[in-house]
Amino acid sequence: MDRHLVISSDCHAGLQPELYRDYLDPKHRDAFDAALPIQMAMIEESEKKFLVKEVNEQWREGRDQALSGAWDHGERVRVLDADGVAGEIIFPDGITEKNTPPFGAGLGLPTEGVDAELQWAGARAHNRWLAEL
């Protein structure tokens, strides 16, 4: 039997939004506290536009533990091992688990009407966390 090394090129990971605070530089934490409720409301609105609630809920049935691999290292390794995946390219997550990086630093990175310093702060916070994952 031939052996193959499997590298996934479409994995997603993100921390639960409120937990990003500890990964931000302290000077950005007040802005984070103010922005978090707005970000969560925007994600909930996006869910209404992009997800069919009933289909999403049906798909998620029985998958909660595996989906927690988006932020739980132990669960992620278990799922990857079960799938035979040896490595992965990881993208920041977003709508389905509400675990997008702060200040718009996730997928669909906005380019207008954003504070670039805060966006970079969100990206750095995500990368700090990702280095621990």
Where do the model's predicted regions map?
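Helix-coil boundary/capping segments in enzymes
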Residues: 1-133
